C-alpha cells in the first residue's frame, strides 16, 4: 500500500442522494471519515436506518467511520406567504408581525415564528433575511410588530431565515425538538453531537447534561455561527473549552459578522481550538458547485486547500453529498485536494508548545513524543496505544508530516479518532502490557503494510493497557 496517508478528514452529510444507487457505500469507499445526520430533516426511523447502514458498510470495507448527529437548533424564520413568494424593492416598507398567522404574508407584511424578535431589536438594527439576500432596517417596534424598510431588495419566499447583523438574538440554543432529537441520538449511539447556535459555554454544558441523562456519551461539537460567540477572545475560549470539537459553521456566522470578517475568524478559531486540544471541522459551501457539476471550481479547490493549511482536522460536505448529483465524486475530489495541500512543507512546521507547562502526564507524554518525532532523523510514524483516544488527539495537535496510528480495542474510540487530523485508527487487542504489547502493535502495523522492516517508530502507552488516562511512557522502536 502507499506509505502516504491523507491527513485531513472528510465529513459527509447523509440525505436522499446517499440513500439511492448504493451511493452511501461509494461515499465511504471514496474516503468519508465521518457521516453527518442532519436532524433538521427526516424521522428518527430514517436516522436509525442510515446509522445502521453506515456501520454495516464500514465493517464490510474495514473502515472506522464516526457518526455525527447535528441538532437543528432555533430556526428564526419568516412565516409563509399567500402566494408562496413576494418581491421586495429597495425603499419598501415591510412589517414583521409575530401575531400574523401562516399563509397570511404578502408584499407588505409577514408573520415570524420567533416571537421574541420584537424584544431583541431596536430602531437602526439591520435584519438579514435568506442569508442576507434581502436586508431590512428596523424603523420602529410596537408590541409584537417590527416595522422595517427594505435596504437590499429581492425575492422572499416561505420560511426563510432571519439573522441580525452583529448578532444578539436571544433564542435559546436548544429547542424542544432538539431535546427529542437527543433521545434519538442516544438510541443511535452517535459518536459526536453537534449543538447549533450556542451563545456561550453554558449552552454546550446544558446539551452535554441532557445527552448524558439520555444515555448518550457523544462528544459535543460546538457549531460556531453566532456573532456573540466570536466577539472577543474570552467569548471564543468559553465556547471552545466547553466543547470537544469546534465547527466553523460559515453560513450563519458569515451572515451575522459579514463575509469580510469570516476569513480571519476561521483562522483564529482553528488556531485557538488546536491550542486548547480541541478538534476542528470547517464547513459550508466547500464544494457547493458539485451539487450539479462533476468538478469543483478553482475557488472551491482553493477554499478546501486553505482550510487544510489553516490546520483544520476535517472539511465538511453538506448538500453536496446529501442532495447532490455527484456525491462520491465530490468526496473523491475533496480527498485529492486535501492530499495536494498536504504536500506543502509549511504545514508540517510546529513550535511544539515550548513555552507551555502541561497539567497532566498524558499531555506531557504526547508532546514529548511529537518533539522526538519531528526532531529525530528517520522516524516514520507515531503509535498511540489508547483506551479513550485522548493521546491520539493531543499528538495530532502538533503539526507533523508523520502518520499517527491510534490503536485501541474499543470500536467507539477508533470511530472518534477517525475525525482527528493525521490519525489512522487501527483495531488492536492484546493481553500483554508494556514493551511486549508495543512490539505486538508495531508488528500488526507492519503486517498491514503501514510499516516496513527498518522503520523507526515512536510508541506511547500506559503501564496497564485497560486503564483510561494512564499513558506515561514513550518508546522508540525499530520495526523488525
Swiss-Prot record:
InterPro entries: Pyr_Knase (IPR001697), Pyrv/PenolPyrv_kinase-like_dom (IPR015813), Pyrv_kinase-like_dom_sf (IPR040442), Pyrv_Knase-like_insert_dom_sf (IPR011037), Pyrv_Knase_AS (IPR018209), Pyrv_Knase_brl (IPR015793), Pyrv_Knase_C (IPR015795), Pyrv_Knase_C_sf (IPR036918). Pfam families: PK, PK_C. Optimum pH is 4.0-6.8. Pathway: Carbohydrate degradation; glycolysis; pyruvate from D-glyceraldehyde 3-phosphate: step 5/5. K(+) binds at residues 38, 40, 70. The keyword Transmembrane does not apply. Coiled coil: none annotated. Allosterically activated by AMP and by several sugar phosphates. Belongs to type II PK. Its cofactor is Mg(2+); K(+). It is an enzyme of class 2 (transferase). GO terms for cellular component: cytoplasm; cytosol. Mg(2+) binds at residues 225, 252. The record marks 223 as: Transition state stabilizer. Substrate binds at residues 36, 223, 251-252, 284. The keyword Kinase applies. One of its GO terms (biological process) is glycolytic process. PANTHER family: PYRUVATE KINASE. Homotetramer. Belongs to the pyruvate kinase family. Catalyzes the formation of pyruvate in the last step of glycolysis, it is irreversible under physiological conditions. The reaction is critical for the control of metabolic flux in the second part of glycolysis. This is Pyruvate kinase II. It comes from Salmonella typhimurium (strain LT2 / SGSC1412 / ATCC 700720). The lineage of its organism: Bacteria, Pseudomonadati, Pseudomonadota, Gammaproteobacteria, Enterobacterales.
Amino acid at each position: 500500500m502507499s506509505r502516504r496517508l491523507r491527513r485531513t478528514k472528510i465529513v459527509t452529510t447523509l440525505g436522499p442522494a446517499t440513500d439511492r444507487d448504493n451511493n452511501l457505500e461509494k461515499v465511504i469507499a471514496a474516503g468519508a471519515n465521518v457521516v453527518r445526520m442532519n436532524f433538521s430533516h427526516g424521522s428518527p426511523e430514517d436516522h436509525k436506518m442510515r446509522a445502521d447502514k453506515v456501520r454495516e458498510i464500514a465493517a464490510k470495507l474495514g473502515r472506522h467511520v464516526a457518526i455525527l448527529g447535528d441538532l437543528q437548533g432555533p430556526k428564526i424564520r419568516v412565516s409563509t406567504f399567500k402566494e408562496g413568494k413576494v418581491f421586495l424593492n429597495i425603499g419598501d416598507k415591510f412589517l414583521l408581525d409575530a401575531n400574523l398567522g401562516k399563509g397570511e404574508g404578502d408584499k407588505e407584511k409577514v408573520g415570524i415564528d420567533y416571537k421574541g424578535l420584537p424584544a431583541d431589536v431596536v430602531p437602526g438594527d439591520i435584519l438579514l433575511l435568506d442569508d442576507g439576500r434581502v436586508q431590512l432596517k428596523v424603523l420602529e417596534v410596537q408590541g409584537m410588530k417590527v416595522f422595517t424598510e427594505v435596504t437590499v431588495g429581492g425575492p422572499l419566499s416561505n420560511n426563510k431565515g432571519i439573522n441580525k447583523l452583529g448578532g444578539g438574538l436571544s433564542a435559546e440554543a436548544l429547542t424542544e425538538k432538539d431535546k427529542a432529537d437527543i433521545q434519538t441520538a442516544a438510541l443511535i449511539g452517535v459518536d459526536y453531537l453537534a449543538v447549533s447556535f450556542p451563545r456561550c459555554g453554558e449552552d454546550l454544558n446544558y446539551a452535554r447534561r441532557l445527552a448524558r441523562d439520555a444515555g448518550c456519551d457523544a462528544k459535543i461539537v460546538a457549531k460556531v455561527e453566532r456573532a456573540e460567540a466570536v466577539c472577543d477572545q474570552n467569548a471564543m475560549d468559553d465556547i471552545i473549552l466547553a466543547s470537544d470539537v469546534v465547527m466553523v459553521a460559515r453560513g450563519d456566522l458569515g451572515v451575522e459578522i459579514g463575509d469580510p470578517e469570516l476569513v480571519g475568524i476561521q483562522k483564529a478559531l482553528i488556531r485557538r481550538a488546536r491550542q486548547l486540544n480541541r478538534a476542528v471541522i470547517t464547513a459550508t459551501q466547500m464544494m457547493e458547485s458539485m451539487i450539479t457539476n462533476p468538478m469543483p471550481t478553482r475557488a472551491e479547490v482553493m477554499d478546501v486547500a486553505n482550510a487544510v493549511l489553516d490546520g483544520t482536522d476535517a472539511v465538511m460536505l453538506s448538500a453536496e453529498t446529501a442532495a447532490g448529483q455527484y456525491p462520491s465524486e465530490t468526496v473523491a475530489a475533496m480527498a485529492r485536494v486535501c492530499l495536494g495541500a498536504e504536500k506543502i512543507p509549511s504545514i508540517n512546521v510546529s513550535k511544539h508548545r515550548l513555552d507551555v507547562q502541561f497539567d497532566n502526564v498524558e499531555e506531557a507524554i504526547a508532546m514529548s513524543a511529537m518533539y522526538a518525532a519531528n526532531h529525530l532523523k528517520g522516524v516514520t510514524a507515531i503509535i498511540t496505544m489508547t483506551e479513550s483516544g485522548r493521546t491520539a488527539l493531543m499528538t495530532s495537535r502538533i503539526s507533523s508530516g508523520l502518520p499517527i496510528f491510534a490503536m485501541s480495542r474499543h470500536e467507539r474510540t477508533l470511530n472518534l479518532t477517525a475525525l482527528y487530523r493525521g490519525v489512522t485508527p487501527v483495531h488492536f487487542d492484546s493481553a500483554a502490557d508494556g514493551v511486549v504489547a508495543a512490539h505486538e502493535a508495531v508488528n500488526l502495523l507492519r503486517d498491514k503494510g503501514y510499516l516496513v522492516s527498518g522503520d523507526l517508530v515512536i510508541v506511547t502507552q500506559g503501564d496497564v493497557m485497560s486503564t483510561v488516562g494512564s499513558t506515561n511512557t514513550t518508546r522508540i522502536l525499530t520495526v523488525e
